[in-house]
C-alpha cells in the first residue's frame, strides 16, 4: 500500500511538470502572436493564438488530472491512517474492557481520554479527505477566446489590429465587435475622467 501511495504522489508530480511545460508553451505561442501582429499578419496570429489557447487548456487538463491523482493519493493515505486508527481503537477497547473489569476509575478515565483523542483524529482525517475531493470540469476553446487573446496581446503591445481585420475571411472573427466594445468602454472612462477633472 505504501508503494501505491509513493507511485501516486510521483505521478501527480509528473503531471504537474507537464502542466508547467504546457503553460510555458502557451506563453511562447503568445509571443509568436505578438510578433505576427507586429508584422501585420493576422492570419498567422490567429493560428498562434489557437495554439496558445490549446496549450493553456492542455496545461489546465494536466493540472486537473494531477489534482485527481493527488486526491486518490489522499484517499490511500487516509486508508492507511484509518487502518492505524482502527488498530489503535481495538487496543483502546481492550484496555477499556480491562480497566472496567478491575473498576479502577483512573484507568477508565485515562482509557476514555485516549479513546476520545482517537475519535477526534478520525474526524480530522475524514474531514481532510472530504475537503481534498472536488469535481473538475473541462473547458472548451471557443472562438471568442482566440479573438480576446489577440486583442489582449495587441493592446498590451500598443498594436492596431482593426485595420488588419479586413484580411480575415468573412465570419472568421468577432474581433471587430470586441474591439468596438473595448473602444466604447475606453470612451466612457475618458468621459468620466474628464467629468472628474471639471
Curated annotation (Swiss-Prot):
Chief location bin: cytoplasm
Pfam families: Snf7 (PF03357)
Coiled coil stretches, renumbered: 7-41, 176-198
Chain segments carrying region Disordered: 171-198
Gene Ontology process terms (BP): cerebellum development; endosome transport via multivesicular body sorting pathway; late endosome to vacuole transport; protein transport
Subcellular compartments: Cytoplasm; Endosome membrane
InterPro entries per the UniProt record, alphabetical: Snf7_fam (IPR005024)
Phenotype reported upon loss of the gene: Reduced cerebellar and forebrain volume. The phenotype of these animals resemble that seen in those after bmi1 knockdown, supporting a link between chmp1a and bmi1. In chmp1a knockdown models, the internal granule and molecular layers were more severely affected than the Purkinje cells, which are consistent with the relatively preserved folia observed in humans with CHMP1A mutations.
Keyword terms of this UniProt record: Coiled coil, Cytoplasm, Endosome, Membrane, Protein transport, Transport
Motif MIT-interacting motif: where in chain: 187-197
Source taxon at top rank: Eukaryota
Topological relation to the membrane, as annotated: Peripheral membrane protein
Any Gene Ontology CC annotation: multivesicular body
Subunit structure: Probable peripherally associated component of the endosomal sorting required for transport complex III (ESCRT-III).
PANTHER family, per database record: CHARGED MULTIVESICULAR BODY PROTEIN (PTHR10476)
UniProt record similarity statement: Belongs to the SNF7 family.
Role played: Probable peripherally associated component of the endosomal sorting required for transport complex III (ESCRT-III) which is involved in multivesicular bodies (MVBs) formation and sorting of endosomal cargo proteins into MVBs. MVBs contain intraluminal vesicles (ILVs) that are generated by invagination and scission from the limiting membrane of the endosome and mostly are delivered to lysosomes enabling degradation of membrane proteins, such as stimulated growth factor receptors, lysosomal enzymes and lipids.
Name of the featured protein: Charged multivesicular body protein 1a
Organism: Danio rerio
Annotated gene: chmp1a
Amino acid at each position: 500500500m505504501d508503494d501505491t501511495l509513493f507511485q501516486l504522489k510521483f505521478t501527480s508530480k509528473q503531471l504537474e511538470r507537464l502542466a508547467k511545460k504546457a503553460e510555458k508553451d502557451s506563453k511562447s505561442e503568445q509571443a509568436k502572436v505578438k510578433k505576427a501582429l507586429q508584422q501585420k499578419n493576422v492570419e498567422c496570429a490567429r493560428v498562434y493564438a489557437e495554439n496558445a489557447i490549446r496549450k493553456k487548456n492542455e496545461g489546465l487538463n494536466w493540472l486537473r488530472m494531477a489534482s485527481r491523482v493527488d486526491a486518490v493519493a489522499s484517499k490511500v493515505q487516509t486508508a492507511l491512517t484509518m487502518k492505524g486508527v482502527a488498530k489503535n481503537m481495538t487496543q483502546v477497547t481492550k484496555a477499556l474492557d480491562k480497566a472496567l473489569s478491575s473498576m479502577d476509575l483512573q484507568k477508565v478515565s485515562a482509557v476514555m481520554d485516549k479513546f476520545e483523542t482517537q475519535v477526534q483524529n478520525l474526524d480530522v482525517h475524514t474531514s481532510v479527505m472530504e475537503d481534498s475531493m472536488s469535481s473538475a470540469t473541462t473547458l472548451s476553446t471557443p472562438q471568442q477566446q482566440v479573438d480576446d487573446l489577440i486583442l489582449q496581446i495587441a493592446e498590451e503591445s500598443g498594436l492596431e489590429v482593426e485595420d488588419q481585420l479586413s484580411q480575415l475571411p468573412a465570419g472568421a472573427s468577432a474581433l471587430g465587435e470586441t474591439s468596438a466594445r473595448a473602444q466604447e468602454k475606453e470612451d466612457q472612462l475618458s468621459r468620466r475622467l474628464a467629468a472628474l477633472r471639471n
